């Protein structure tokens, strides 16, 4: 990272954003506004499977450390405030406040209940402890929307990224690859490929101004990004035009410069200009106020490698050989008529998906064009397989997307190839059989692990197919400027990349 970003002039105290402070999909790491230092929150999909107590010791040590920090900060409090400039006093008070509420973002509702959310208390979202029984916007749509962009810290400038330019796409890939979501132990980091980013960021209706970048003025280096994509969302009995907020990322060396809140305010302004006032996003941290909470589960496909890179561990009384045998899969799928999705299947996949999602409370409402974009197979991005019966009718389909993770500091293995369950629809084939075949197909394609959230009907097959619950954070689902009762994971029917 060039000197420009390190030496950029300190920004003025950030104004409280008026905006859709969501960030999506962990993607969707919004609590930067409360604690800028921890910009990359774990969405849950990276965390090792929970089959050992090996981390308990670490947690104890961490707690001790935090206790020490709190004590130290308390001792530091009697500074001669009146001998310092007002700006410096504010900084010290802010630091003391951070220590007093505990280090880092809240991972559980219990932790969150002890935090104060000064930023989120100004936003159109329900309060954490609020019991919501109504449905509708928190505040009405705005008529007069700010026309000029928000002010960035000195030395930085806005740039709407043209992802059709391979050089720009590569810059975004590099920013995310080096600074985006890591697991809590800094062992794995999402590795979104340039092609995957085009798939995730350019669905039907995408707008270039919603690919919102921040550059260093002098070097033109890309140091920040946030995105929005359009989506029709069905929430309980209402269908609403929203955006999905995603890929909030700030370069590690800029985490103290309060860039993230400005990014979120700016994407909100740009979305408001298009007449959209609601958003959906996910995060691995607890903010006011989750509408649903899901958890990642992991199914070993290549147990030896997963153990070698410490993604999972040998259970007590288990040898490597017995573990390999436990997770062994058939050589080929067993469902008759299972084949890759073709162009001719788009209308029937659209129909099957639309019908299936009606049973859930939070779902996308996709057009046929969107179904083509999100489900038509692309190598190393999205795989969809349909089941065609003897009469030539497509009755079921399964899908998973590809999202590898970089393995940090391992002498042999550099990448972990992970498949993520997307949408799976069954009318004739039992879901258990369909997902068993999904595992076989993923194994055949060289994946190391198959990840799935416990949403929709997924709980019915997770344990039976030998998935293990992740030991990472929950994935929280949020709505911006929309109030509704919260729901169980089994009623969430929305998967964000």
UniProtKB/Swiss-Prot annotation:
Keyword Cytoplasm attached: yes
Reactions catalysed according to its record: N-terminal glycyl-[protein] + tetradecanoyl-CoA = N-tetradecanoylglycyl-[protein] + CoA + H(+)
GO cellular component: cytoplasm; cytosol; membrane
Protein topology in the membrane: Peripheral membrane protein
Binding site for tetradecanoyl-CoA: 118-120, 247-250, 256, 258-260
Superkingdom field: Eukaryota
Any one GO molecular-function label of the UniProt entry: glycylpeptide N-tetradecanoyltransferase activity
Function: Adds a myristoyl group to the N-terminal glycine residue of certain cellular and viral proteins.
Protein name per Swiss-Prot or TrEMBL: Glycylpeptide N-tetradecanoyltransferase 1
Annotated gene: NMT1
């Amino acid at each position: 990272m060039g000197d420009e970003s390190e030496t950029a002039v300190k920004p003025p105290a950030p104004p409280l954003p008026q905006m859709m402070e969501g960030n999506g999909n962990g993607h969707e790491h919004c609590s930067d506004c409360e604690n800028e230092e921890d910009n990359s929150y774990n969405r849950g999909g990276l965390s090792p499977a929970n089959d050992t107590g090996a981390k308990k010791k670490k947690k104890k040590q961490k707690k001790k450390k935090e206790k020490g920090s709190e004590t130290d900060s308390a001792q530091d409090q009697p500074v001669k405030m009146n001998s310092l400039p007002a700006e410096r006093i504010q900084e010290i008070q802010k630091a003391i406040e951070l220590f007093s509420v505990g280090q880092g973002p809240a991972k559980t509702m219990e932790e969150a209940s002890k935090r104060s959310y000064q930023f989120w208390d100004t936003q159109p979202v329900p309060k954490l402890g609020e019991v919501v029984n109504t449905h509708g916007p928190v505040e009405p749509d705005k008529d007069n929307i700010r026309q000029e962009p928000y002010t960035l810290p000195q030395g930085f400038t806005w740039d709407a990224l043209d992802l059709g330019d391979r050089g720009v796409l590569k810059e975004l890939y590099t920013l995310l690859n080096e600074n985006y979501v890591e697991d809590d132990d800094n062992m794995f980091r999402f590795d979104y490929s340039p092609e995957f980013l085009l798939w995730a960021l350019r669905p039907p209706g995408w707008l270039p101004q919603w690919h919102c970048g921040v550059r260093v003025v002098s070097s033109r280096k890309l140091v920040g990004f946030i995105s929005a994509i359009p989506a029709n969302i069905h929430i309980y009995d209402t269908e609403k035009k929203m955006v999905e907020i995603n890929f909030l990322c700030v370069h590690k060396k800029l985490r103290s410069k309060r860039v993230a809140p400005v990014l979120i305010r700016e994407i909100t302004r740009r979305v408001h200009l298009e007449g959209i006032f609601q958003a959906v996003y996910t995060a691995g941290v607890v903010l006011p106020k989750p509408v649903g909470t899901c958890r990642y589960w992991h199914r070993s496909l290549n147990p030896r490698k997963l153990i070698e890179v410490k993604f999972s561990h040998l259970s007590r009384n288990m040898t490597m050989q017995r573990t390999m045998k436990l997770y062994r899969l058939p050589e080929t799928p067993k469902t008759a008529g299972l084949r890759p999705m073709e162009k001719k299947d788009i209308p029937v996949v659209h129909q099957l998906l639309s019908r299936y999602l009606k049973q859930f409370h939070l779902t996308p409402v996709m057009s046929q064009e969107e179904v083509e974009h999100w489900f038509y197979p692309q190598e190393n991005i999205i795989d969809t397989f349909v089941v065609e019966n003897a009469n030539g009718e497509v009755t079921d389909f399964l899908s998973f997307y590809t999202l590898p993770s970089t393995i940090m500091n391992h002498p042999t293995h550099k990448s972990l190839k992970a498949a993520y369950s997307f949408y799976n629809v069954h009318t004739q084939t039992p879901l258990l059989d369909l997902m068993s075949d999904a595992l076989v197909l993923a194994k055949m394609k060289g994946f190391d692990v198959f990840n799935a959230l416990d949403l929709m009907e997924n709980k019915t097959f997770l344990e039976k197919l030998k998935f293990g619950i992740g030991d990472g954070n929950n994935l929280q689902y949020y709505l911006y400027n929309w109030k509704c009762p919260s729901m169980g994971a089994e009623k969430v029917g929305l998967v964000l990349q």
